[in-house]
A protein has these predicted regions:
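Peptidoglycan glycan-strand catalytic modules in the bacterial/periplasmic cell-wall system
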Residues: 46-49, 53-308, 317, 324-326, ...
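Short, well-structured active-site flanking segments
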Residues: 95-105, 184-187, 246-251, 500-521, ...
Length: 775
């Protein structure tokens, strides 16, 4: 009887062993479940975010899909603390086993399978956990499914150990794990929770992150600080048991509070948000096809077509192929994009915008509109027109679109927009919670002044700073490169350049009186002037530009051809085809972007050579191989002699004219510039340049009818110039950037900007004028 029992047990055991062998062979061959092929095991599919770097190699941000914001980190870049904490907590015999820890597996089987102890710990090794993350996409929903899934993980874990070193497995695990809050992978997690690189993680910080590996939602340190701290202390205790830290270290670290340096990873936040979004749009642009554009988008089709042919960065993803023949994907291919943005200069630009626009100008604008039924629109605008504009804005909202699609009537929609509700809104002092109607929120957001700012190196086109608006989260329309506004008097340097190219000089004179020209319709046109000082006197062209005098501009326009002026403006890199060749063009009614203006003004600082904005210097793949480089694009647009004459006059704008306010900010540098203000103070401009930097700034409302009522605050010298000056002062005050206020423009020896001019005896050359220009 006993022999029969023993024989039966042996047969039963043999059947079990045979069944196990058959199961594992079947799994290994792929007959049961999914077994990845060798190629997939050797090269598991990872989706890595693209990193955008500044020129000083600071990470500006990343591009990724929402659940794949992962940045690759090599083993050598990991802190020993994170490795020790992970091994001590998750797989203490990691270096000893080959994918399956028999001791841990047996312990788990006995305590959990036979004794039903839920807190007995698991038997999964790090290799098995990695196998689960990499190749078992369908998570088991019950115990039975888990029983079938476990053997598959065991086989994959053994194969992973065969193909990879222990260090590679640890690195893969930490790169793959999702630490929540859009922090996938150890590099993003280290920055998100502690504001540092993985190699700089302290022991207690590493323990916090490893503690999340058990259950990231349960031990989320942002939501559950104390619970996460408790889990961190468990990890520290495991490190003590494993001998990685001493008893004293463990006790002192466990006593520490859990302190986070939380940095929310969001493409809408951080430094240079408008720049990053503009760059993303440029790189992912498809090849322009006319049928994809509506009738009113022909200007965009024209610009996109030129960019596709001339700009290697435009449509980069569509133009470049990977080794497997597919196009690059900026969201998953782990690219490294090295931009021309300087992180400190970018910060200075954003700080200047906040200090002047947010802290000073915006409160004044709010106060001016206080009590006005038309607010934020001009008081002179009819109430009916204000209502039309607000209704139009309402119909452009996502709320309106969704309600319309749901079948709501106009009356129902309007009622919803007039019903107060809780909401979080933007303010320059930080987001604030309030209660207002959606309609009032439209008025509220339209009350904020917008801005565009760009700064670039005239020698190579490197864009150093780029600000497209007050806050990208709430104001996503880019006023730096995308939006175009009327330029006002900042167009006058183009007019004067055309005059210099046609033989005029800064010392040529005109009588300072009203000028009447015949416009394209045969109608007399007489521009208004800001003032009548020196009325009836003979004044130089230099005086006319320095004082932004409309009569002298009209005088020159009468001597020149508006068609030639349009051609010259286009030659300066302006691509707006809707610039009409009319006599009033000399006062700047046309619309140009800040980026186009900055690029155009580089010609004045660069001996007549205009340089296009350069945003990226090189792109590397995930392995660090350089796959694209980018060079400056330059073009001579005016002669060097005309450039020197323009330098004389544009410098006078600062030293003697409308741009003199710059000097109040401690800017002593040799520079030229031009202010600009459009009708009703709708747009305020300042363009300024030194030998090493060309920068431009625009300030205006969301619409042309939203503006200051008084020129005191709405003119270019008051609204835009201070941002430029504050930025430059910060740049000059930072010696590490290498910009020097002692730098001077260089003229050819013996150059006479007034050669050939018939300035009569007795003409007064303004103080600080031609004779001592470059001393």
């Amino acid at each position: 009887m006993i022999r029969k029992i023993i024989k039966a047990l042996w047969i039963f055991l043999a059947v079990i062993v045979l069944a196990i062998v058959i199961v594992f062979v079947s799994i290994s061959k792929g007959w049961i479940g999914y077994m990845p092929p060798v190629e997939e095991l050797e090269n598991p599919s990872y989706k890595f975010a693209t990193e955008i770097f500044s020129e000083d190699e600071k990470v500006l941000g990343t591009w990724s899909y929402s659940k794949e914001n992962r940045v690759y980190t090599a083993y050598k870049d990991l802190s020993p603390s994170i490795i020790n904490a992970l091994i001590a907590t998750e797989d203490v015999r990691f270096v000893e086993h080959s994918g399956i820890d028999a001791k841990a597996l047996f312990r788990a089987f006995v305590k959990r399978g036979l004794m039903f102890q839920k807190n007995a710990g698991g038997g999964s090794t790090l290799s098995q956990q990695l196998a689960k993350q990499l190749f078992t996409e369908n998570v088991a929903r019950n115990t039975l499914q888990r029983l079938f899934q476990k053997p598959i993980e065991w086989v994959i874990a053994v194969k992973l150990e065969r193909y990879y070193t222990k260090e590679e497995i640890l690195s893969m695990y930490l790169n793959k794990f999702d630490f929540l809050n859009n922090a996938v992978g150890i590099k993003t997690a280290a920055y998100t929770y502690f504001g540092c690189e993985p190699k700089d993680l302290k022991i207690e910080e590493a323990a916090t992150l490893v503690g999340m590996c058990k259950n990231p939602s349960l031990y989320n340190p942002v939501r559950f600080n104390e619970r996460s701290r408790g889990r961190r202390n468990v990890v520290l205790e495991q490190m003590r048991k494993a001998g990685y830290i001493t008893d004293a270290e463990c006790d002192s670290l466990q006593a520490l509070p859990l302190k986070l340096t939380y940095n929310r990873v969001d493409h809408k936040e951080g430094l240079a948000t408008y720049f990053r979004e503009y760059l993303r749009g440029v790189m992912t642009a498809p090849k322009p096809v006319r049928s994809d554009y509506r009738g009113w988008q022909m200007q965009k089709f024209y610009e996109d077509s030129i960019a596709w042919e001339t700009n290697p960065l435009y449509g980069w993803c569509a133009k470049n192929k990977k080794k497997d023949g597919t196009n690059y994907n900026i969201y998953t291919d782990g690219l490294k994009i090295y931009t021309t943005i300087n992180s400190r200069m970018q910060q200075y630009a954003e700080d200047a915008v906040k200090e002047h626009l947010g802290d000073y100008l915006q409160p004044i604008f709010f106060k001016e509109k206080e009590g006005s039924k038309n607010a934020p629109y001009a008081r002179s605008l009819p109430e009916k027109r204000v209502e039309e504009l607000l209704t139009k804005a309402m119909k452009q909202t996502e709320r309106y679109r969704l309600m319309k699609e749901a079948g709501a009537s106009e009356q129902q929609i309007r009622k919803a927009f007039d019903t107060p509700e809780e909401m979080t809104v933007f303010s320059w002092k930080g987001d604030k919670d309030t209660i207002m109607t959606p309609m009032d929120s439209i008025r509220y957001y339209k009350s904020f002044l917008r801005t565009g700012f760009m700064s670039m190196d005239p020698a190579n086109g490197h864009v150093k700073a780029y600000v497209g608006g007050p806050n990208y989260v709430y104001f996503q329309y880019d006023m730096a490169m995308v939006g175009r506004r009327q330029v006002g008097s900042t167009i006058k340097p183009y007019l004067y350049t055309l005059a210099m190219e046609n033989g005029f000089s800064p010392c040529d004179q005109a009588r300072h009186v009203e000028q009447t020209l015949i416009d394209e319709n045969g109608t007399p046109w007489t521009p208004r002037n800001a003032n009548d000082k020196r009325y009836g006197e003979m004044v130089t062209l230099k005086w006319g530009l320095a004082n932004s005098d409309n009569w002298i501009s009209a005088y020159l326009m009468g001597k020149l051809n508006p068609y030639d002026l349009v051609r010259l403006i286009h030659s300066f890199g302006v691509r707006n085809k809707a610039i009409d060749p009319v006599v009033s063009l000399c006062l700047g009614p046309c619309e140009i972007s800040v980026g186009e203006m900055v690029s155009a003004y580089t010609a004045f600082a660069n001996k007549g050579i205009r340089v296009a904005p350069l945003f990226v210097t090189r792109i590397e793949d995930s392995d660090g191989n350089v796959i694209s480089t980018f060079a400056p694009q330059m073009e001579e647009v005016i002669s060097a002699s005309s450039t020197y004459k323009m330098l004389v006059m544009l410098r006078a704008v600062i030293n003697e004219g409308t741009g003199g306010r710059v000097r109040r900010y401690g800017i002593t540098a040799d520079m030229g510039g031009k202010t600009g203000t459009t009708n009703d103070n709708s747009d305020a401009w300042f363009m300024g340049f030194t030998p090493s930097l060309v920068s431009g700034c625009l300030v205006g409302g969301d619409e042309r009818d939203i503006h200051f009522g008084r020129m005191t605050y709405g003119q270019g010298a008051a609204a835009a110039l201070p941002i430029w000056a504050m930025y430059m002062k910060k740049v000059y005050d930072d010696p590490t950037l290498g910009y020097d206020q002692q730098e001077r423009f260089k003229l050819p020896e013996g150059f006479d900007p007034c050669a050939g001019s018939e300035t009569p005896d007795g003409e007064v050359i303004e103080e600080g004028g031609l004779d001592d220009l470059f001393n």
